[in-house]
Amino acid sequence: MIKVGVFGALGRMGSEVVKAVEAADDTELVAGIDVGDDRGKVLGADVVVDFTHPDAVMDNLRWLIEHGIHAVVGTTGFDDARLAEVRRMLDAKPGVNVLIAPNFGIAAVLMMHFAAKAAPYFESAEIIELHHPNKADAPSGTAYRTAELIGAARAHAGLGDAPDATTSELPGARGAQVDGVRVHALRITGMIAHQEVVFGTHGETLRIRHDSMNRESFMPGVLLGVRKVASLPDRLTVGLESLLGL
């Protein structure tokens, strides 16, 4: 039985994680805590799942690593600098693993994988991500990671910049740019989590889209992370790809 704690247990994602942990046959909920609660309640957990806020997650990780507790993190806002800081924390505390996933939806992970595979074959690639208006960061971690994967695949294939004759624009009209890939973030009431990758070349386009209709859709990926994090070969793992054999 894997003993699990949940940070952000009263949030939309955290409350789903609590239900999933309680329902699974091989996991036991030690404690679910939220803002203002004592983190010491999760001492004794094998793994803690963090769905909190970009402003809180680094301090949470520091505390978990210091106390020898594996972490599965769905909180967004991780750039290269933050990942490097997590690696430094882990170097100081052998025996602890951290899994950070931009998206725990297995279909979303497959969408990112397919996008990276398609990228070398198209001149143009842009990403549109759509989320609920309470999301704190933009672009989403999923869109950022997808852009990184597409950018790397394009670079490996020797592709240059995507064609774009824009010389005059309102600030932000062409979106943000991540590794040469334009990313557009929409925040719409009624949405949960959606992403579309649009590829184009002469005479044809390809669209790869993923839609999460509810937060329950992320739970198989979260539980996979909980079950696998302690045995992962790398101290820090980013994304579910290796857990899925991709």
From Swiss-Prot:
Do the record's keywords include NAD? Answer: yes
Q: Which domain of life is it from?
A: Bacteria
**UniProt signal peptide:** none
Keywords annotated in UniProt: Amino-acid biosynthesis, Cytoplasm, Diaminopimelate biosynthesis, Lysine biosynthesis, NAD, NADP, Oxidoreductase
Q: Which SUPFAM superfamilies does the protein's record reference?
A: Glyceraldehyde-3-phosphate dehydrogenase-like, C-terminal domain (SSF55347), NAD(P)-binding Rossmann-fold domains (SSF51735)
Main enzyme class: oxidoreductase
The protein's Enzyme Commission number: 1.17.1.8
Might you name a Gene Ontology BP term for this protein? diaminopimelate biosynthetic process
**Which family is annotated?**
Belongs to the DapB family.
Role played: Catalyzes the conversion of 4-hydroxy-tetrahydrodipicolinate (HTPA) to tetrahydrodipicolinate.
Please report the name of this protein according to its UniProt entry.
4-hydroxy-tetrahydrodipicolinate reductase
Q: State the organism named in the record.
A: Thermobifida fusca (strain YX)
